[in-house]
Amino acid sequence: MDKSESTSAGRNRRRRLRRGSRSASSSSDANFRVLSQQLSRLNKTLAAGRPTINHPTFVGSERCKPGYTFTSITLRPPKIDRESYYGKRLLLPDSVMEYDKKLVSRIQIRVNPLPKFDSTVWVTVRKVSASSDLSVAAISAMFADGASPVLVYQYAASGVQANNKLLYDLSAMRADIGDMRKYAVLVYSKDDTLETDELVLHVDVEHQRIPTSGVLPV
């Protein structure tokens, strides 16, 4: 074989090697694209269940309706004697109340017992007249008429009873933020005196988004 043939054979070998290298690279690129597509689909699936500014998580477990968010307030009942009652109107922050025509879809109450809690309480949320003074007699009658759901919360050795939430759906009533002044959270201490530092009630009001809802609620 003369020098020109040797040079030609060397070039052919290099071409074959380069073609093989390009083929391996193309295969790797294709695999990478497939993997990227799979990861993208997985990310979209996971993202669908995440809270976002437009679709926050309602009460830590269920997402708000599209276009809705929620405002939370905290109530700490004072001492309630055995077989006596406590009532507190829902007073949302002024920054929320100024959008009084925004619709409210649901109210959720979460009962959070403090370490010394050892009682049984009944909890409900009711629409009450503007003239009601939320006296013991008035609250007693509202618990007795069966017009709204009641959560019976009892002492649990674990510290938190599994069923510690009450959901009140207002969608059919077309209630709005302005109407929240007409609603009250009511508590009945059934068997024991409820001390001031025994119970905390977290009230979450799900309503249409307002301009002040610039961050996810906590």
Swiss-Prot record:
Please note every region of biased composition (Low complexity). 1-10
Q: Which residues carry this modification: N-acetylmethionine?
A: 1
Do you know which Pfam families this protein is assigned to?
Cucumo_coat
Q: Which UniProt keywords apply?
A: Acetylation, Capsid protein, Ribonucleoprotein, RNA-binding, T=3 icosahedral capsid protein, Viral nucleoprotein, Virion
Source organism, top-level taxon:
Viruses
Q: Where in the cell is it found?
A: Virion
Chief subcellular site? Answer: virion
Q: Name one GO molecular function term.
A: RNA binding
Q: Does the keyword NAD apply?
A: no
Q: What segment(s) does the record annotate as region Disordered? A: 1-30
Comp. bias intervals (Basic residues): 11-21
What this chain does, per the entry, is described as: Capsid protein. Probably binds RNA and plays a role in packaging.
Q: What remark about domains does the record contain?
A: The N-terminal arginine-rich stretch does not seem to be the major RNA-binding region that allows formation of an infectious ribonucleoprotein complex.
Protein family (similarity comment): Belongs to the cucumovirus capsid protein family.
Record protein name field: Capsid protein
